[in-house]
Amino acid sequence: MARIIYKEGLEGRNRLECVEGIEIDLLNGQRALIYPRYSNEELLDPKDRDRWLDAGISVMRALRLRDNQAATAALLKAGSPAARFATKFTSKKFGRFGLPTLLAAMEITEQEGEIDKLAREIDGADLLEDFSSYVWSCSRSKRDYGWIASGFYGYAYGCGLYHRYVAAPLVLLDTAADARLRF
């Protein structure tokens, strides 16, 4: 079930600057916080593909990924427009946003209606329905492809890095909490 997470002391104020984001549950038991600002971006310009040092992984490995921060950082280092967009958002409480894991991207497309219903209550928030129905993940499938979630068809597949699909800023909450405990 999706819900709005407010910044401390700003509960009930439905302006973008007063919210941490919209929380959703993932199939694997994790929770994710989505910042309701989106942009259709290339994952990576083909000329920069060799700068992305992450190896391609299978769809199963991409679905099992439980941390998006390292993969987003690798994309950012390679010059990814999608990663650059997602990481410009931060939260004092939850840290830096990144691109979603493949499972989180699939949940975003699956829960689009619930997410948009809450986003309509927040002044300044974007609606997913106004963007491409394909959401980038932070995982590479092959040399020239990244994993995306398709909202039209309800499945994941590898797609060319140069396509402009939704960059959805997201923090995996359980991962963010684990990282705070280690320091």
Stretches found by the model and what they are:
Residues M1-K93, R164-L170, A176-F183:
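Extracellular adhesion/carbohydrate-recognition regions
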Residues G79-G98, L102-G158, L173:
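An exposed tryptophan-centered "aromatic clamp" motif
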Residues C159-H163:
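Extracellular carbohydrate recognition
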